[in-house]
């Protein structure tokens, strides 16, 4: 994370086999497509607590302190009842940590301090038409982060912060971000094994964002030059208590997450501001029976959200309450895990919503889910595993009620949206390999996921076309996005991953991680009508897809590898990411109206160049990054990082061109 000059943790997630991030949306093994940040099937957690906004269900990546990350755990599929609704597709758990005793003992009275600073610039793209800025001056980004930890008797104290400014490669997408974090943990002096503490993160930012490009030729300019600038504050405060007595462990984790967003377009207020408050508690009790190798975990999770915004049609509140219990049993070389979870959701809206002719103010539903798994050691260093688990996700407020306009594209509400349900299963083999000074783990897995009423962010004609006084269409023909249930779906595939390290000689070693994932995401109800457009025409997966043999906005093949060579004080590393062509998108994106316009209505191309770009990128994307570093002395290190080494043009989805080559210089100090 540090060596790659990671300014947001979501970019580091891209290097994990089977994981992709699109517009902030985490996707594990093709379980999700693209939803513009509304709702998440992947539960992203920091220190075992969700970091997802209560209104839009959006992961708060920018709030995560990259300067204090110990490890990242990825659980693929719905395999544990310890995690709730948003874990339908898997879990990403980011763990922070107090520095090691070795680091602290270097300066016991002063503690441990880490300072990282970087300065980077954005290269010119290969096509001159993409350059909208001064052709003699490159766009720059720069940042500084610090982390300090100190042990004061029985108190562990950490503080950290980050300042980041980015002029951006896309016109208007300027970022100005400041973040501060702290943690305070105390071991009680009177009660043995009683630990309590508090953590917090505070983010103050101004960020520009665009939904789609102006054209393929002007891929770094937003449609109609419209940028949404969000100025806001986000913070979380997390008090917690842990107590162990005998074979019993009690923990209470709590979180208050507050989000304020003030949005404007071209300097004018949009009335799209939103505010939300989230209250979260999780109490967990673990009992270990050592004589029979049995661990019982049981607990309750409660979450209450209050949100207010015109884009969500006023004031809304949501509550989620759950009970869960899981047993883990060891029988010789066999480990067994099984559990159940009961989820209850309710949502209250100040403004009623019409559903089937009735005005509804209150939504509520509940559902149990069951999950289990086996892990068996066949031989030394050889393990086989299998798991099966149910999943369930209640729609977010954004998916149900959002009404807004982004870059002239309307986002429509759908209060009739139903919860999605499903199950996932996996069978896998993990093999440890030792060859001389090299040690690695090879993992191969086959997986399948089934969903009922899958929610998808779908582009279509959901609104009525409007015309100006000259008879020209003034509202994009009523086109826009809406979350809809698309019926039954299935995602199956295989995944191969490898991690390892080794010594070439006494001063040279190598680390590597890589993986390949094949996915076959399909609709099981291709011709079933799941919605109607504004004119009442039935919409099916078949008639709304550019390639109905695969689910929308997904890949079939994804491969990644990262290798780092360390020799004495010098290090060099490289990352490679490949994905094949995103063959299925909303069919309407490929039509003449979108790409060429309609002279009968005096309409130019609405989003020019989508078909042209898809033809150019039909062989997929292959992106290389490279980094070098040199340890100057015991406390200081310099580095140089190049992302998108060959300055390749590529898109994460239609009409969203990714950045050209970037360069960054680093100076890292550890005192």
Predicted segments, located by residue:
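Extracytoplasmic beta-strand/coil segments of soluble accessory domains associated
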Residues: 10-49, 53
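Short acidic/polar hinge/loop motifs at secondary-structure boundaries
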Residues: 15, 49-78
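Structural signature of Gram-negative outer-membrane beta-barrels, strongest in the C-terminal barrel
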Residues: 199, 241, 293-295, 301, ...
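Membrane-embedded beta-barrel scaffold of Gram-negative outer-membrane proteins
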Residues: 251-263, 385, 418-480, 484, ...
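Flexible loop and strand-edge segments within Gram-negative outer membrane beta-barrel domains
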Residues: 166-181, 185-244, 248-250, 254-280, ...
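Surface-exposed extracellular loop regions of Gram-negative outer-membrane beta-barrel proteins
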Residues: 149-183, 210, 249-258, 262-264, ...
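Gram-negative outer-membrane beta-barrel transporters
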Residues: 116, 447-450, 475-588, 634
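Predominantly transmembrane beta-strands of Gram-negative outer membrane beta-barrel pores used
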Residues: 41-43, 71-75, 91-97, 103-172, ...
């Amino acid at each position: 994370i540090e060596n790659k000059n990671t300014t947001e943790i979501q970019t580091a997630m891209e290097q994990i086999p089977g994981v992709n991030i699109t517009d902030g949306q985490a996707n594990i093994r093709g379980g999700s497509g693209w939803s513009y940040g509304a709702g998440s099937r992947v539960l992203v957690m920091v220190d075992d607590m969700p970091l997802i906004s209560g209104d839009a269900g959006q992961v708060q990546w920018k709030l995560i302190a990259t300067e204090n990350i110990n490890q990242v755990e990825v659980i693929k599929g719905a395999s544990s009842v310890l995690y709730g609704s948003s874990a339908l597709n898997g879990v990403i758990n980011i763990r922070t940590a107090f520095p090691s005793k070795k680091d602290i003992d270097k300066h016991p009275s002063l503690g441990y301090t880490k300072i990282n600073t970087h300065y980077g610039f954005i290269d010119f793209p290969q096509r001159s038409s993409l350059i909208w800025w001064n052709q003699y001056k490159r766009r720059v980004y720069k940042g500084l982060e610090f982390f300090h930890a100190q042990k004061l008797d029985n108190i562990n104290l950490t503080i950290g912060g980050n300042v980041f400014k980015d002029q951006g490669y896309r016109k208007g997408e300027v970022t100005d971000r400041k973040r501060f974090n702290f943690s305070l943990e105390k071991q009680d002096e009177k009660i043995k094994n009683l630990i309590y503490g508090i953590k917090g993160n505070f983010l103050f930012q101004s960020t520009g964002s665009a939904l789609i490009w102006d054209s393929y030729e002007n891929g770094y300019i937003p449609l109609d030059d419209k940028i949404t600038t969000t100025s806001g504050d986000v913070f979380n405060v997390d008090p917690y208590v842990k107590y162990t007595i005998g074979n019993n462990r009690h923990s209470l984790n709590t979180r208050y997450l507050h989000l304020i967003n003030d949005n404007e377009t071209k300097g004018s207020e949009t009335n799209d501001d939103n505010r939300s408050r989230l209250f979260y508690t999780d109490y967990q009790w673990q009992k270990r029976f050592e004589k029979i190798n049995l661990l019982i975990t049981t607990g309750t999770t409660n979450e209450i959200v209050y949100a207010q915004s015109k884009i969500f049609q006023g004031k809304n509140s949501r509550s989620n309450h759950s009970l869960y219990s899981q047993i883990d049993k060891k029988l010789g070389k066999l480990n067994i895990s099984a559990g159940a979870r009961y989820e209850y959701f309710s949502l209250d809206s100040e403004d009623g919503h019409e559903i089937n002719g009735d005005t509804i103010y209150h939504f509520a539903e509940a559902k149990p889910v069951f999950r289990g798994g086996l892990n068996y050691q066949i031989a030394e260093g050889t393990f086989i595993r299998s798991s099966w688990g149910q999943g369930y996700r209640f729609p977010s407020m954004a998916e149900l009620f959002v009404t807004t306009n982004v870059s002239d594209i309307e986002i429509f509400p759908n209060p009739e949206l139903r919860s999605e349900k499903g199950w996932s299963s996996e069978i896998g083999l993990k093999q440890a390999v030792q060859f001389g000074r090299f040690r690695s783990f090879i993992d191969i897995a086959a997986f399948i996921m089934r969903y009922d009423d899958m929610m998808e962010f779908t582009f279509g004609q959901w609104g009525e076309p409007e015309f100006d006084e000259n008879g020209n269409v003034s509202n994009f023909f009523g086109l826009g996005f809406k979350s809809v249930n698309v019926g039954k779906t299935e995602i199956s595939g295989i995944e191969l991953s490898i991690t390892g390290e080794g010594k070439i000689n006494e001063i040279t070693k190598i680390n590597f991680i890589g993986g390949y994932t094949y996915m076959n995401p399909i609709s099981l109800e291709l011709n079933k009508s799941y919605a109607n457009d504004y004119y009442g025409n039935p919409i099916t997966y078949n008639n709304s897809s550019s390639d109905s043999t695969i689910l929308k906005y997904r890949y079939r093949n994804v491969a990644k590898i990262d290798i780092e060579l360390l020799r004495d004080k010098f290090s060099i590393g490289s990352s490679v990411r490949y994905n094949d062509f995103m063959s299925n998108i909303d069919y309407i994106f490929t039509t003449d109206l979108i790409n060429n316009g309609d002279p009968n209505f005096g309409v130019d191309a609405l989003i020019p160049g989508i078909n042209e770009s898809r033809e150019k990128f039909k062989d997929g994307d292959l992106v290389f990054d490279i980094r070098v570093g040199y340890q100057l002395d015991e406390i200081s290190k310099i580095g140089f990082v190049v992302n998108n080494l060959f300055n390749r043009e590529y898109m994460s989805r239609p009409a969203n061109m990714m950045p050209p080559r970037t360069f960054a210089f680093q100076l890292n100090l550890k005192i």
